Amino acid sequence: MQDNTNDKELVLQAMREYGRSKAAQLQEASAEMTGTELYAQEQYIPDFQAAKAAMNMSQRKLGENDGFLCRSTAGHVVRLIGSYDSDVWPGEPETLLSQWKFVWAKDPKKARPFLALSTSPYDTGDCCTYPAEDETLHVYRSGKDGNVWPPRTLNVQWTDLGPVGGPYIEEDA
């Protein structure tokens, strides 16, 4: 019987190289992509903790639209907009809000927990999750650009699409 260990290692190595290549291509193309497109490719967006371990954030590319892209442990896709020493400040992007621009998706299945951030407001169609009146987690869609107010705030345009996990109510259905 033949030992397939070498074949298995070759396949794993090829898969890792493919993943690294796709991740690098995504970083390059991300400036032209929407939040929805980025979340659809999130398997190629590096985990924040792994990225921080590989290279200090002070050495990563900064940019409002083309800065380094990663995914927080909470699942938010974020872009580095402010330099900082991640050895000194090791916290997740949710704890260093001025260093990161959060990216939102219009796909309700990719909605992430609501964050009130003036640096990363929700635009028309962007989705988030937030507790409904009965305290169950629902998906909400922003009805205006520059929205920094949480869903269910009086006189703020959000549409309740239903409980997390769907099915989701679509306005044009």
Task: Go through each PLM region and give its residues.
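Tryptophan-rich substrate-binding surfaces of secreted polymer-degrading and adhesive proteins
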Residues: Q2-A173
